[in-house]
């Protein structure tokens, strides 16, 4: 299949195996959920009745006081007592096989092509870290909300984009399913596209 390079108006031949797949919604959903779950801290913790201090001695004798029987001052029904079913730190990460992850990424890229949300440019560099210059370049392509994908780190591009809402910059190695589906457009350079094709082949 062929994709048009927007700034040179030339056609670029790309693999149908990577950019012409059918959309697998279930697999993409699984990849997105797994990625987001991996970002959860899972550090919350509460104290149960075995964690709170005190509670060794029986507060009063079992019978004769007229009060309800009690064995510890750290019972969950007491003030300052332990929490019932206390939260513990846990790992939320989900395992997703490499083969499934790559298939999900192929599916996402194919859908981006189908929806005309993948914008290919020959190169996308800015001479200086100026937001104004980047805005002009994006405006020339008719893009306002986009993930810019490059083949290597570009400090000027990153500094120019970091103050723009709805614009982010990523290298091919840092791509993730959430970023790809979360922007209106994915602006990708030809070298980066070749890297993606090689990675997902």
UniProtKB/Swiss-Prot annotation:
GO terms for cellular component: ribonucleoprotein complex; ribosome. PANTHER family: 50S RIBOSOMAL PROTEIN L4, LARGE RIBOSOMAL SUBUNIT PROTEIN UL4M. NCBIfam families: rplD_bact. One of the primary rRNA binding proteins, this protein initially binds near the 5'-end of the 23S rRNA. It is important during the early stages of 50S assembly. It makes multiple contacts with different domains of the 23S rRNA in the assembled 50S subunit and ribosome. Forms part of the polypeptide exit tunnel. Belongs to the universal ribosomal protein uL4 family. It comes from the Bacteria. It comes from Thioalkalivibrio sulfidiphilus (strain HL-EbGR7). Keywords: Ribonucleoprotein, Ribosomal protein, RNA-binding, rRNA-binding. Residues 43-69 are annotated as: Disordered. One of its GO terms (molecular function) is structural constituent of ribosome. Part of the 50S ribosomal subunit. InterPro entries: Ribosomal_uL4 (IPR002136), Ribosomal_uL4-like (IPR013005), Ribosomal_uL4_dom_sf (IPR023574). GO terms for biological process: translation. The lineage of its organism: Bacteria, Pseudomonadati, Pseudomonadota, Gammaproteobacteria, Chromatiales. The keyword Ribosomal protein applies. This is Large ribosomal subunit protein uL4.
